[in-house]
Every structure is written in structure tokens, then in C-alpha cells.
């Protein structure tokens, strides 16, 4: 076994296993999609047969919650209810175009909070561009922060996989962190971070009239026609009664989860051990029940659900999390004592550094749920307080750092002026500063609030 050989030459096997994990993540990102999950399985195989490490535990609770939430959100999308939400957002943006730099991120953040996934915001991006350009506002200003805000809203959503991950992992470690407690920390902190980043965005870049690159593009008649192309709007699209019914049922499902997690807990049955039922299975069956009611009352076709963008993105996330989180748990659980000894002194002196570790891991993993699935158990193993771990949750969004996430790429494509861009040096892109400001401020505020809430 490689572990024995490495110990004989004075190198702890953890470092080789960590290198293998980073290599798996690198190639998983290069291939994209479900590749990260598949390669995670390959990594576990290599750890088992080359290093003699027993496989860790796959995050079954997290995976089941994601499946339940994503399926119900996909059912909502299949009824056209997402277009109803986008329609309401567009009305607000067009009514106050001069405030688009604030209203755009508020709309994308709220949309993500409502449906639990940032992939629901794509129909809103061309609307934001149209409103900004029509008002003479540099589109980069509202569009970049709108994309960032759409992902910041994930940990502030009661039906997101990331929030469910926090509750599930805390329960696994016998720590009672409820859905309302998480929301009390993440909602205000992420909103404050988003608004600070939006304020910075108000004056970013040159006005279009003073931007030489933009003015040069406008000299080309074909480019001018492309930039000033027809406006995009969903206001003229009909809204069906099915969409209204589906949205009502979905919202009632969210309210039910929040109520059962707080004031209505006595209504829940006891488990086989006579203990109060945790919120992990409750989130699963309530969301599936909401999806079933939408199915019955709207008559939406099951095939339309499985063909939806939300379902596709969610199932990719499930495979990613199963493979890479399982491999990460294998590395961590197989070397827990060594890792704890290595990091405990520093983390005890400066607990906030754990948030930096979460941020760094997220930049590569590109999933808040997957990042929290890997890092929170390590935080508990290091003896960090629940308040510190909960305060670190907003730091799980760092995949704006390398600008290759679908929502960021879509934002760049929808900005026909070219002001929202990936820079020459890759890291100097439009999302870097608003992302760092938004996540940084949100994490600091969350750390402060968590000390009171938990």
C-alpha cells in the first residue's frame, strides 16, 4: 500500500491523498457537468485500493433533500410559474429604470430565495440589460451584481440544497440548528452584503458616452444594430391559471416547512427512538407533497418536469455532490486525527480563518451545497462552535472567482455592449469586485449575527 511506503519515508499519506483530490477536482471542472461526480468515484476507488483507506459516508440526507427540492422546483418551472415571477420582476424594473443597479440584484436575489436555485434567473438577464441600456446606464453595473446576487440568495433560501445541507449535517453531529435560525443569519447578512456591493457598482466603469471601447464598437453599423437590437420583455406573454395555482402551492409548501421548523414542531410524529422528528425528512416529504399537489391541480406533464432546466441542473448537482463529497469525506475521515492536529491550533486562535478555507474550496468546487457538505463536518471535527460554522455559511459562494459558472457566462452573453466581460488576465473580470464585496460583507455580518442567534 502507498500509505505504508509514504510513512516509511517520513511523509504522511494525507498529502498524497489531498493531491489526488485536487487533481480529481481539476479534471472534473475541465470536463464539466456530471464529470466531477464520476471522477469522485474514481478517486474513491484509487483511495481504497492504492492507499487502503476505507470509503467514507456519502451524504445521503443531502442528496435526498436536493432531489426533493429540485423536483418540486422543476414542477413549478414546467407550469410556467417562473415566468410569472419574472413578469413581476420586470414590471418593477421598468417602473423604476433609474434604480436598476439596486433593483436588479434585489430581483435576482429574491427569485433565488423563492425557488432555491440560481438557475431560475436566466429569463431576467436580458430584461436587466434592456432596462439599463435604454436608460443609458452602463449594463455592467446592474448585470454583474445581479448575477452575483442570484447565487448569494441560495443560502438565504428555505428550500435550497445548501440550507438543507447545513441543517442535515448539524443534525448528524447532534447539534440543533433549525431552518429559522439559519435564515435569521443568512437572509439579513446576504442582503446587506448584496446592497453594499450594489452601492459600489453604481459608479463602476465609465459611462457609455465616455467609454472609448464601446464608442468604437458603435462605429460599426452591424455592431450598432446588434447592440441596439429589439428589446426583450415577458410582459406581453399570457399567464395561465395553472401557473398561478402552482406558485400558490409552492409558496404554501415553503411556509409549511418554516412553520414546522418553528412554531408547529409539536405536530410532527416521533421517530423510531421516540425522539422528535428532525427537519431533514420533513423538508423531503413536504416538498415532494407540494410537487404532487402542483401535479394534481395543474395537470402538468411529468415529462415536462424531467425535461426542465431546473431538473437537469439539479440532477447534475446530485451526481457532483455524491462523487466529490464522498471522496472528500473519505480523505477527511481517513486522516481526521492528523488534520485536526494540523489545523486545530490555528483555528482555535483565529476561528474566522475557517471561512477563508470554505471560500477557497468553493472557488474550485462551484457548488455551495457540495462545499458545505465537505467542509462543515471538518469544522465540527475541529471543535468549532456552531455559531462560527453558521457564520461561515455565506463564504460557501466563491465560484465567481474563476468566471466560468453558467450564470456568469450567460450574463456576459446577454450584455450586448460588451461591458460585462472576462478580462485579459482572467481574474480581472466583471464579477470579481462585487463578488468579493458581497460575500465578504455578508460573512462578517453573518459571524456577528450568529453569535446572537445560535
Identify the role of each PLM range:
Residues 27-29, 38-42, 48, 53-142, ...:
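Membrane-embedded alpha-helical segments and adjacent helix-loop junctions characteristic
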Residues 61-70, 182-197, 275-287, 388-402:
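Alpha-helical transmembrane segments
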Residues 158-171, 262-270, 327, 331-336, ...:
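Membrane-helix interface motif
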Amino acid at each position: 500500500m502507498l500509505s505504508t511506503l509514504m510513512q516509511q519515508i517520513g511523509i504522511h499519506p494525507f498529502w498524497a491523498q489531498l493531491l489526488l483530490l485536487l487533481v480529481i477536482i481539476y479534471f472534473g471542472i475541465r470536463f464539466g457537468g456530471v464529470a466531477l461526480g464520476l471522477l469522485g468515484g474514481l478517486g474513491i476507488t484509487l483511495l481504497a485500493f492504492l492507499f487502503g483507506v476505507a470509503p467514507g459516508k456519502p451524504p445521503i440526507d443531502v442528496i435526498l433533500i436536493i432531489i426533493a427540492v429540485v423536483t418540486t422546483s422543476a414542477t413549478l418551472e414546467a407550469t410556467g410559474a417562473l415566468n410569472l415571477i419574472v413578469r413581476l420582476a420586470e414590471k418593477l424594473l421598468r417602473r423604476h429604470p433609474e434604480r436598476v443597479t439596486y433593483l436588479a440584484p434585489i430581483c435576482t436575489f429574491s427569485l433565488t430565495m423563492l425557488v432555491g436555485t440560481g438557475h431560475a434567473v436566466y429569463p431576467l438577464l436580458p430584461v436587466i440589460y434592456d432596462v439599463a441600456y435604454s436608460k443609458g446606464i452602463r449594463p455592467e453595473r446592474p448585470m454583474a451584481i445581479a448575477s452575483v446576487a442570484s447565487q448569494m440568495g441560495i443560502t438565504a433560501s428555505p428550500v435550497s440544497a445548501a440550507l438543507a445541507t447545513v441543517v442535515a449535517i448539524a443534525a448528524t453531529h447532534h447539534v440543533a440548528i433549525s431552518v429559522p435560525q439559519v435564515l435569521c443569519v443568512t437572509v439579513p447578512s446576504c442582503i446587506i452584503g448584496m446592497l453594499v456591493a450594489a452601492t459600489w457598482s453604481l459608479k463602476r466603469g465609465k459611462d457609455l458616452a465616455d467609454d472609448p471601447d464601446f464608442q468604437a464598437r458603435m462605429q460599426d453599423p452591424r455592431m450598432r444594430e446588434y447592440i441596439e437590437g429589439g428589446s426583450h420583455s415577458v410582459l406581453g406573454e399570457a399567464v395561465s391559471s395553472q401557473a398561478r395555482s402552482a406558485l400558490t402551492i409552492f409558496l404554501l409548501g415553503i411556509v409549511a416547512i418554516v412553520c414546522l421548523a418553528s412554531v408547529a414542531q409539536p405536530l410532527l410524529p416521533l421517530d423510531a427512538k421516540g425522539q422528535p422528528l428532525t427537519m431533514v425528512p420533513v423538508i423531503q416529504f413536504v416538498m415532494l407533497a407540494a410537487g404532487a399537489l402542483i401535479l394534481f391541480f395543474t395537470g402538468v406533464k411529468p415529462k415536462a418536469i424531467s425535461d426542465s432546466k431546473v431538473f437537469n441542473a439539479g440532477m447534475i448537482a446530485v451526481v457532483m455532490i455524491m462523487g466529490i463529497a464522498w471522496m472528500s469525506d473519505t480523505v477527511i475521515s481517513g486522516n481526521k486525527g492528523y488534520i485536526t492536529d494540523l489545523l486545530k491550533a490555528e483555528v482555535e486562535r483565529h476561528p474566522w480563518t475557517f471561512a477563508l478555507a470554505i471560500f477557497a474550496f468553493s472557488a474550485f468546487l462551484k457548488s455551495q451545497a457540495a462545499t458545505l457538505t465537505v467542509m462543515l463536518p471538518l469544522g465540527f471535527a475541529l471543535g468549532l462552535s456552531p455559531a462560527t460554522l453558521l457564520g461561515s455559511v455565506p463564504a460557501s459562494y466563491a465560484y465567481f472567482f474563476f468566471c466560468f459558472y453558467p450564470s456568469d457566462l450567460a450574463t456576459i452573453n446577454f450584455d450586448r455592449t460588451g461591458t460585462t466581460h472576462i478580462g485579459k488576465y482572467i481574474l480581472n473580470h466583471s464579477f470579481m469586485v462585487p463578488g468579493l464585496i458581497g460575500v465578504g460583507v455578508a460573512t462578517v455580518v453573518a459571524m456577528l449575527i450568529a453569535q446572537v442567534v445560535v
